[in-house]
Regions:
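Bacterial N-terminal signal peptides
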Residues: 5-16
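Noncatalytic scaffold domains of N-terminal-nucleophile
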Residues: 21-75, 79, 87-252
Length: 252
């Protein structure tokens, strides 16, 4: 892995963060449009992705802020900041929780790309922690051994060598102040104890039921009697918790 002067996860964090806010998020009233917000209708849901016609809640903080697509992940990052960790430590902690609660978006078996700005140096660093393709992935392997004309769209033979953990390790080693023991603790605990399915994640599970049923292990973790769990039900992933505990203990 190499950093290039010039992290992309689903997170943006900084220890000293300022955002210019509009005084009127719906636009400035004009003669043609005296009430620009009149047609904005509140939408239900967790707003994990944002909703048409409605912005997310504003957060103003003096000492640090954490923004993710999941409240548990944001809480994990905030705890790290409150405990004395820096923005990179918090980003890794939040990312690890997302690897548990948001596996339709991210996971420790995936890749990691990051942008890190160091204010003291006035430098922007980019990290590409994409995994390598397995050495056995040859045209002959797919055609002769698997009977395929191309790389499949799912399954073990569709995934490259995981790069996420190496990326987390590189970030912590280069820019962090903590290690896996501290930054992975909340994620491991959530995988062990379970997490509730909000509206967005429940909808994702319902839409993925058929694909999840096609894989016995995925069905065991994410489905109940071949169906998505009811809204707000608790999911647990003990095997993932074991993997996270091993990384805490042994590192990359």
């Amino acid at each position: 892995l190499k950093f290039f002067p010039v992290i992309l996860t689903t997170i943006f964090l900084t220890s000293n963060f300022a955002v210019a806010q509009s005084l009127n998020p719906f636009g400035i009233p004009t003669e043609e449009s005296p009430t620009p917000a009149a047609n904005v209708v509140a939408a239900s849901g967790s707003r994990a992705q944002g909703w048409l016609g409605q912005g997310r809640s504003e957060v103003i903080a003096r000492h640090g802020i954490v923004a993710t697509s999941d409240t548990l992940a944001a809480q994990a990052g905030l705890e790290i900041l409150q405990g004395g960790g820096n923005a990179i430590d918090a980003a890794v902690a939040a990312g690890a929780v997302l690897d548990v609660t948001s596996q339709n978006d991210t996971g420790i078996a995936g890749d990691l790309f990051a942008l890190v700005y160091i204010a003291q140096e006035n430098k922007l660093y980019a990290l590409n922690s994409a995994g390598w393709a397995p050495s056995g992935w040859t045209p002959e392997f797919f055609k002769n051994d698997l009977g395929l004309e191309s790389v499949p769209g799912s399954g073990v033979n569709a995934a490259t060598v995981p790069g996420a953990i190496s990326g987390y390790d590189a970030l912590l080693s280069r820019f962090g102040t903590l290690g896996f023991q501290e930054t992975f603790e909340r994620a491991a605990r959530i995988a062990e104890e379970g997490w509730g399915q909000g509206e967005r994640r429940h909808r994702d599970l319902v839409s993925a039921e058929r694909r999840l049923r096609n894989d016995d292990y995925s069905a065991e973790v994410f489905l109940e009697k071949d169906k998505a769990p009811d809204l707000y039900n608790i999911l647990r992933n003990p095997d993932l918790a074991t993997a996270l505990r091993l990384i805490q203990k042994d590192g990359r």
